[in-house]
UniProtKB/Swiss-Prot annotation:
Cystine bridges: 103-176
Alphabetical GO biological process terms: adaptive immune response; antifungal innate immune response; brain development; calcium-mediated signaling; cell chemotaxis; cellular response to lipopolysaccharide; central nervous system maturation; host-mediated regulation of intestinal microbiota composition
Family of the protein in this entry: Belongs to the G-protein coupled receptor 1 family.
Membrane-topology descriptor: Multi-pass membrane protein
Cytoplasmic side: 48-68, 127-147, 208-232, 297-358
Lineage: Eukaryota, Metazoa, Chordata, Craniata, Vertebrata
Gene: CX3CR1
Main localisation: membrane
GO MF annotation terms: C-C chemokine binding; C-C chemokine receptor activity; C-X3-C chemokine binding; C-X3-C chemokine receptor activity; CX3C chemokine receptor binding
UniProt protein name: CX3C chemokine receptor 1
Residue numbers of Phosphothreonine PTMs: 349
């Protein structure tokens, strides 16, 4: 079984040297309950939040910016990822498992969405670095066309990096697992874990940390009353990414060591198995926070949610005329406020998009 996929419910024992059996039955049962509940919550909140981002960007009447392109692709990556969670929930509670084609396809979507989401978070960090720290030099490159080209490259990279994770996946006796060739059985799981640790965590974290550190240096040198909020949001982005993904990646690293029998005691193996189930769910729930951190903290997304709320209220309360009139007034007021806000930021960003600071 891949390290980031739900563990099989039928593998209740693990065997080691001297034919010693390590009973995992209670850990598997507890992990199954935990995974089913939290995967369902992550799916529900992740689906709603990221769909709102997609609808807000598509329905926005303003011209699209490069930031919008990246936010849209981040939301699509998260949607692709959370769309697989009901299948894994079904897998851990149903003895029939998944059909071969479904097993292969869902595993592929899972890892493409997994790496795609992290890669787009990293790209957004680099884009903000270019927009704020290198504003003058990057102005001509930060176009929508450039954003589309970069996004296609990120998707290609996500597919390429995800391929080793699902290329050997198959269904056998109601189990969806990695069936590696004999020559690769020992080294391939190590390669997969190392790929997740490095390309899925360490490298993105280093890039994000550098970009946001340089951004904060630039903001501290600017005399602007909005910079305190921007710095808090930047700090939030890095801290949330670190807190949600670090425990899981530590467990993946310990699991790699376990492949070399660094933890011979059964109790340690049991604790590690449970810890992976807990920390992976915490890490996966990060996709529920992406809309809040990257999108809804921006003015345009709050405006969209407000308009959506008023439309729903109009339908429920049967006062469409009144709400339409007040909405037009508030839209005019928001437009004036937006123009003032935009002018406050254009002196140190290359596109004047306030969301670039989030």
């Amino acid at each position: 079984m891949h390290t980031t996929l739900p563990e099989s419910t039928s593998e209740n024992f693990e065997y080691y040297d001297l034919a010693e059996a390590c009973d995992m039955g209670d850990i598997v049962a507890l992990g199954t309950v935990f995974v089913v509940i939290l995967y369902s919550l992550v799916f529900a909140f992740g689906l709603v939040g990221n769909l709102l981002v997609v609808f807000a960007l598509i329905n926005s009447q303003r011209s699209k910016s490069i930031t919008d392109i990246y936010l849209l692709n981040l939301a699509l990556s998260d949607l692709l990822f959370v769309a697989t969670l009901p299948f894994w929930t079904h897998y851990v509670i149903n003895e029939q498992g998944l059909h071969h084609a479904t097993c292969k396809l869902i595993t592929a979507f899972f890892f493409i969405g997994f790496f795609g989401g992290i890669f787009f978070i990293t790209v957004i960090s680099v884009d903000r670095f270019l927009a704020i720290v290198l504003a003058a030099n990057s102005m001509s490159n930060r176009t929508v066309q450039h954003g589309v080209t970069t996004s296609l490259g990120v998707w290609a990279a996500a597919i390429l990096v995800a391929t080793p994770q699902f290329m050997f996946t198959r269904e056998k006796e109601n189990e969806c697992f990695g069936d590696y060739p004999e020559i690769l059985q020992e080294i391939w799981p190590v390669i997969l874990n190392t790929e997740i640790n490095f390309l899925g965590f360490l490298l993105p974290l280093l890039i994000m940390s550098y970009c946001y550190f340089r951004i904060m240096q630039t903001l501290f040198s600017c005399k602007n009353h909005k910079k305190a909020k921007a710095i808090r949001l930047i700090f939030l982005v890095v801290v949330v990414f670190f807190l949600f993904w670090t425990p899981y990646n530590v467990m993946i690293f310990l699991q790699t060591l376990n492949l070399y029998d660094f933890f011979p005691k059964c109790d340690v193996k049991r604790d590690l198995k449970l810890a992976i189930s807990v920390t992976e769910t915490i890490a996966f729930s990060h996709c529920c926070l992406n809309p809040l951190i990257y999108a809804f903290a921006g003015e345009k997304f709050r405006r969209y949610l407000y308009r959506l709320y008023r439309k729903c209220l109009a339908v429920l309360c049967c006062h469409p005329d009144h709400l339409s009139f007040s909405s037009s007034l508030s839209e005019s007021q928001r437009s004036r406020r937006e123009s003032v806000l935009s002018s406050n930021f254009t002196h140190y960003t290359s596109d004047g998009d306030a969301s670039i600071l989030l």
